[in-house]
Amino acid sequence: DDLLLENNTFYKDVIDAYIRQPQDHTSIPYSDHTIPGLVYLSDYDLGTNDVAYYDQDVANYSLSTDQYEAWNKGWSYRNDGVDLQENSDATNSNGLHISFVEKDEWVNYTLDVQQSGFYNIDLRYATPQSGGQLKYLINGNDVSEQITLSNSGGWTYFTNHSTNNVYIQEGVQTFKIFVLGTTSFNMSSLNFSISNDPPPAMQAMGAITVSDERSVRLALNHPLNAQTIEVSDFEFLINGNTSNIESIQIDPTNSLVLVITLSDYLHYQDDLKINHAGGVINSVYNSLLGTLVNFPVQ
């Protein structure tokens, strides 16, 4: 009887883990996420830990420690490492939420964005304590500042936190929720809606090093006009010392990003900062990037 289809439940994540993931170390969508629209956070991409998501607890170590530890501590919906629990929230909910979040954990979602523009993002969350922290990234680049959550009244009392005027480009994009702090919270959905506000002032959102060990990606909140970026308008500091900048270019695949290439190689423990004079780099919304003083690079 166990072999009869009517006596079995289909779990697409289990099938994907057995058949695709051993040969294909990429992520694929779990569900279709059309933006503008609602994304249920339980429907993060399919893939292994550190590819589609990162969770601190992803395995059962009972054989080596003689102690059982669940990888999905919520015991619901999926067999991956992300902790999912059921809830009774009636707003923007499919009855599930991500729980037991810890610092540096993250989840990815493949979005099909119908039009470029500024979006308001409403996170549905619950927590009995203030101070939960997270940020949003698209294709590895920061698109939000640090987000700090307030006490919602309890683990089961869900409310919204709005992050407004986030620029998202049309097309298929990978959206990441990254947990920053040690204060835990539950999160169930994201609602993306087109902003009706005037464009915000242009600003730098974040900067990261890349794998060639000589380049840095500086993410902005506005797409840029085609223009020449003068090296002399920037200063790059490595451990407090000025480093020679070879070139600064707009990323040809993402006009929200400046690529800064250096003469010196970068090392893991280096303290990296960016200074910029301001008032010369123009966006498609005719907004100028302001002054940057000791802007940190991750």
Which residues make up each language-model segment?
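Ser/Thr- and Asn-enriched, surface-exposed coil loops between beta-strands
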Residues: K103, G171, D212-R214, P252-L256
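Extracytoplasmic
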Residues: D2-Q203, Y268, Q298
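Short, surface-exposed alpha-helix to beta-strand junction/turn motifs within ectodomains of secreted
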Residues: E213-Q249, K273-G279
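Acidic, Ser/Thr/Gly/Pro-rich low-complexity segments and short DxT(G/T)-type signature motifs
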Residues: P199-A207, K273-Q298
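A surface-exposed beta-strand-loop module
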Residues: S255-Q269
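Residue-level detection of beta-strand-connecting loop/turn positions
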Residues: G140, G240, S283-S287
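Acidic glycine-/aspartate-rich tracts in secreted/extracellular proteins
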Residues: T182, D197, H222-A226, Y265-L266, ...
